[in-house]
Each structure stands twice: as structure tokens, then as C-alpha cells.
Swiss-Prot record:
Gene Ontology molecular function, alphabetical: acyl-phosphate glycerol-3-phosphate acyltransferase activity
Family: Belongs to the PlsY family.
A Gene Ontology cellular-component term: plasma membrane
Organism domain of life: Bacteria
Name this polypeptide is given: Glycerol-3-phosphate acyltransferase
Length: 198
């Protein structure tokens, strides 16, 4: 059980690395928290520091999700765990996302979790990620509003998990991740309702 606790904590800390803030500060000298929406995610980084820095942030946020899950998959293949592998990896995924969304390094105010969620599920439920990506790119044909596409990805992934009959632990994990993503987009949802979102 000790290995589970340690890897969950390390995964949370990995997710907590405020990549958008650090990269933007290093490459442009801008504190992304003081510009645009104030969010450290790649969408706001693009707004305040340009496409190149935003793309670097996006890649790093995705890797932040992939790497802990990959390492924990390797651990699960070598060590007998007190819980199922699906349960273990699902807990790791939620830890990474929570770390990103509520990073202790920035007063528990992190990003909105889209890229890190996609990265975390990339190895755990690749078909669900693919379904989310398809929905995202289809919606690009109809809207430029990033929050609509992001929320749609979050909703699509648990639906895909259910449709694909993935293990219940992974499906529940996807539902929780979707809930966190929607929660982090609550201000965007309010603006959408008021027709103020851009």
C-alpha cells in the first residue's frame, strides 16, 4: 500500500508543475496570471504570449498526464498491488488532474485540465481520447470558442468509455475527470449562457 500512496503523491506533484506559468515567464517574461483570463492554461498563454509558447505549454501539459501514468503502468506490471491495476491507474489519473487544476505552487489555482486530462487518458483509454479528438476537430468547423470544444471533449470521453465497455474503474475515473473539467470551466459556462464567451 505504501507504493500506492507514494506514487499517488508523486503523480499529484507532477501534475502540479505549473508549466504554462513557468514556460511563459521564462520565454516571454510575462506572468500569464496577470493577463487575459488569468488562467495558466495553453489557451490563455496563446492569448498573451503567442502560438509558439502556447504549443510548448500544450505539449508539456499533455506529457504531464502521460508520464506519471506510463511510469505507474510499469510499476503495476512489476509489483503486486493491493488494488486492481485499473483502480490504481484511475487514482493516478485523478491525482495528476487534481495537481494540475489545483497546484499548490500557485495557491491551489491551476489550469482547466483539458490537455493534462487528455494526456492522462492517452494510455489508459486511447480510444476514448481519439473519440474526444474527433469531436474537438469536428466542432472546429462550427465554432472558434475553445471552451465549447474543451467541454465537449470532456463529455465525450466518459460516454466513449461506457460505449466501449471499459473497466468500471476507468469509466468512473472518466466521469470524475469530466466533472472536474466542467467545474474548471464554470466561468466559461456562465459567459456562454450570457452570450459573452469569445
Amino acid at each position: 500500500m505504501i507504493i500506492v500512496i507514494i506514487t499517488v503523491m508523486v503523480s499529484f506533484l507532477c501534475g502540479s508543475i505549473p508549466t504554462g506559468y513557468l514556460i511563459t515567464k521564462k520565454l516571454s517574461g510575462i506572468d500569464v496570471r496577470t493577463k487575459g483570463s488569468g488562467n495558466i492554461g495553453s489557451t490563455n498563454v496563446k492569448r498573451v504570449a503567442g502560438t509558439k509558447i502556447s504549443m510548448i505549454t500544450q505539449v508539456m501539459d499533455i506529457l504531464k498526464g502521460i508520464i506519471p501514468v506510463l511510469l505507474c503502468m510499469l510499476i503495476a506490471s512489476k509489483i503486486k498491488l493491493p488494488i486492481s491495476t485499473s483502480m490504481y491507474l484511475s487514482i493516478i489519473v485523478i491525482a495528476v488532474i487534481l495537481g494540475h487544476d489545483y497546484t499548490p505552487f500557485l495557491g491551489f489555482n491551476g489550469g482547466k485540465g483539458v490537455n493534462t486530462t487528455v494526456g492522462a487518458f492517452f494510455l489508459l483509454a486511447p480510444a476514448a481520447v481519439l473519440a474526444g479528438a474527433v469531436v474537438y476537430f469536428v466542432l472546429r468547423l462550427f465554432t472558434k470558442i475553445v471552451s465549447i470544444k474543451s467541454i465537449a471533449v470532456g463529455i465525450t470521453m466518459p460516454i466513449a468509455c461506457i460505449a466501449l465497455r471499459l473497466p468500471i474503474e476507468i469509466t468512473v475515473c472518466a466521469i470524475i475527470a469530466c466533472g472536474l473539467l466542467i467545474l474548471r470551466h464554470k466561468d466559461n459556462l456562465i459567459r456562454l449562457v450570457n452570450n459573452e464567451e469569445k
